[in-house]
Regions:
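Short glycine/proline-enriched turns and hinge-like loops at secondary-structure junctions
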Residues: 67-68, 134-136, 160-164
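Short beta-strand-to-turn element immediately C-terminal to the catalytic PLP-Schiff-base lysine
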Residues: 100-103, 143, 169-172, 181-184, ...
Length: 371
C-alpha cells in the first residue's frame, strides 16, 4: 500500500479546489446557508455536467466515472475545506452507497444514472426521533408485500431531506428492517426543514402517512446493508473533516503571522506556537486515519469496520479541537459573525455528532476488535 496520492489524484484535487474556490467562496456559503434549499442549483448542475463529481465512485455501467473511494475522499476533503453548501454528501455518499450495497440491480439501474448525472438528488432517512443510529430504534412500519409497500412514521435529522427528489427509507416489516425508495413529492409525505446549529448542512423532519414505497434489496436485510453503508459513510465524513481541519489550521497560522501585539507577531509567542504545533499534530494524525480509511473502503477489506470507527472518532475530535483553537488564536474577531471561524466550528460540531459521536465509535471499535 502506498500512502502517497497518485499524480492523477493530485490533479483531481487541484481541479476540484479551483472549481470550489470559484463557486464556493465564503460569500457564496453565507448566501446559500440563509436559503431554505441551502444550495445553488446552477452550481450543482455544473458539478454534474462539467465536473462529473456526482458519479465519481459510481461504476461506469450505471453512468458513473468508476473511480475508487480514494478519489471520492479527495473530492470530499476539498468540499470540507470550502464548506460547500450542496446535497453532495446526502446524494453521493448516503444514497448512492446504499444503492450500491443493496444488491438490487434493478434499483441501481433505475436510480444511479440520475445520481451520477446530477439530475437526481437523494438521501437516506434512517434516524428517528430518538436520534440514535441503532437497529432497535427503528420503529417506522411498512405494510404491504412483494415490492409495493406503504410507510407510516417519522424520520428525523435527514440530510437535505426537504429537497431530495428520492429518499431511501428504513422501516420495519414482518421480516425485520428493510429499505424502501420513496419519491420526494409522494402523497402523504410531509417534509419540514429543521433549524440547526450548522446552517451549511441542511436537515429535515420527514413525516410519512401511508406513503407509497418500493422495496430495495431483500426484505428483512436492511440493517445488514445499513451497517456496511455506515462504515463507508463515516470514512467519507472523516475525509471531509480533515479538509476542514486543515483549513482552520491554515487560517490560524496565517493570522498568527500577521497579527501584531506588543510589537511582534503573535506567532512568535510560545503559547501560540504550541497551540499551532498541537493543531498540526492532530490534523496530520487525522489525515493518516482518514486516508487509511479511504484505502480500506476502496478495497472493501476486513479492516474497514474497525478503521471506519477509528477514523470517525479521531477525526471528529481533531477537527473540533482545531476549529476551537482557531477561534482562540484569532481572539475577539474570531467570535464575530463576520469572521468565518464560527462557520467551521459549527460544521465541526455537527459532523462530530453525525452517524455516531466519538464515544459511540470508540465503544463500537472496542467491540469490533474484541475488547
Amino acid at each position: 500500500m502506498n500512502f502517497a496520492f497518485t499524480e492523477e489524484q493530485e490533479e483531481l484535487r487541484k481541479t476540484v479546489r479551483a472549481f470550489l474556490d470559484a463557486k464556493s467562496p465564503e460569500t457564496a456559503v453565507r448566501e446559500q446557508m440563509e436559503t431554505v434549499n441551502g444550495f445553488d442549483p446552477a452550481v450543482w448542475a455544473q458539478m454534474g455536467s462539467q465536473m462529473g463529481l456526482m458519479g465519481i465512485h459510481i461504476p461506469e455501467e450505471f453512468g458513473g466515472m468508476g473511480f475508487t473511494y480514494i478519489e471520492l475522499g479527495v473530492v470530499l476533503e476539498e468540499m470540507g475545506r470550502s464548506l460547500l453548501c450542496a446535497p453532495f454528501f446526502s446524494t453521493v455518499v448516503l444514497a448512492a452507497n446504499t444503492l450500491l450495497q443493496s444488491g438490487d440491480d434493478a434499483a441501481k439501474k433505475k436510480y444511479l444514472p440520475g445520481i451520477a448525472s446530477g439530475e437526481t438528488t437523494a438521501t437516506l432517512a434512517s434516524v428517528e426521533p430518538s436520534g440514535k443510529w441503532d437497529e432497535a430504534r427503528i420503529t417506522m412500519k411498512a405494510k404491504g408485500s412483494g415490492s409495493s409497500f406503504t410507510l407510516s412514521g417519522t424520520k428525523m435529522f435527514v440530510l437535505d431531506g426537504h429537497t431530495a427528489s428520492m429518499i431511501i427509507v428504513s422501516a420495519l416489516t414482518s421480516k425485520g428492517v428493510s429499505l424502501f425508495a420513496v419519491d420526494g413529492n409522494a402523497k402523504g409525505l410531509t417534509r419540514t426543514a429543521l433549524s440547526t446549529m450548522d446552517q451549511t448542512r441542511k436537515q429535515a423532519k420527514l413525516e410519512f402517512s401511508d406513503v407509497a414505497a418500493t422495496l430495495i434489496g431483500t426484505e428483512g436485510k436492511g440493517w445488514d446493508v445499513l451497517s456496511r453503508v455506515n462504515d463507508l459513510v463515516v470514512v467519507a465524513l472523516a475525509a471531509e473533516q480533515v479538509g476542514g481541519a486543515q483549513k482552520v489550521l491554515d487560517m490560524a497560522v496565517e493570522y498568527a503571522k500577521v497579527r501584531v501585539q506588543f510589537g511582534r507577531p503573535i506567532g512568535s509567542f510560545q503559547a501560540i506556537k504550541h497551540k499551532c504545533a498541537d493543531m498540526l499534530l492532530e490534523v496530520e494524525s487525522a489525515k493518516s486515519a482518514a486516508y487509511y480509511g479511504m484505502w480500506c473502503a476502496s478495497e472493501m477489506n476486513e479492516e474497514l469496520p474497525s478503521v471506519a470507527s477509528l477514523s470517525k472518532a479521531y477525526c471528529s475530535e481533531a477537527y473540533f479541537h482545531a476549529a476551537a483553537e482557531n477561534i482562540q488564536i484569532h481572539g475577539g474577531i474570531g467570535f464575530t459573525w463576520e469572521h468565518p471561524a464560527h462557520l467551521y466550528f459549527k460544521r465541526a460540531k455537527s459532523s462530530e455528532l453525525l452517524f455516531g459521536d466519538p464515544t459511540y465509535h470508540r465503544e463500537l471499535l472496542a467491540q469490533r476488535i474484541g475488547i
